[in-house]
Amino acid sequence: MISKEKKNTLHIASCSFGKDSLATILLALEHGEPLDEAVYCEVMFDKRTSGEVPEHRAFIYETALPRLERLGIPVRVLRSDKTYLNLFAGTVTRGPKKGLRRGFPLCGHCYVQRDCKLRPIRRYNRTLTPDTVQYVGIASDEPVRLRHLQGDQVSLLEKYHYTEEDAKQLCQTAGLLSPVYAFTDRGGCWFCPNAKRKELRHLYDHHPELWARMLELQAMPGKVSEKFNRTERFSDIDAAFRKEDALCSKAA
């Protein structure tokens, strides 16, 4: 249930439906912390296809979101009018790369995060009163991230001394742990240039239709860069996985 202690101050929880943000909500409920709503921003690959790994998106909409609403926590879903695909295909309008397609976002300078996630969140934040309290999912064993909290941001995981592993166990016990933790320790879009090898291998093995979309983008001419991440083209990763499969088949 939503706490009635809030009076005139709004309390919201930033929620990716990962272990830390869901554990934050569970702690708020357990300890009677004021909480008015959870806010989730969904990045889209195109107008119909989510940027969430399919298993995580199914978990969000089929398990976690309905569960939170049954517990009395309304969930506000934000989306940008821009998608990964139309940003990728967009044309650079100035500078030495003028006329080229933007192509794959750069690690550390992700235009997708900026335009598809941060801007909708900031637009929503501008509608809030200055005294709004935002709960963020940063664990007690993340000191660097905790030091960067703004004045209106609160970590309930720090307050109640929950580490990342504690948060994971809390979600597991509550039946609210995303299945993506079976193959990754981080959240992120399935097209993220920071994706680890294990995450990419999961996409290759289990979602060939999405993998094929990325190969189509790799083949698109006139991009700023051919690199998917700092060192490789997406087609290089595809070739490496095909080689691994061939070696496994030969060994068998």
Where would I find each of the regions flagged by the language model?
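Nucleotide-activated chemistry modules centered on ATP-dependent adenylation/adenylyltransferase
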Residues: 1-252
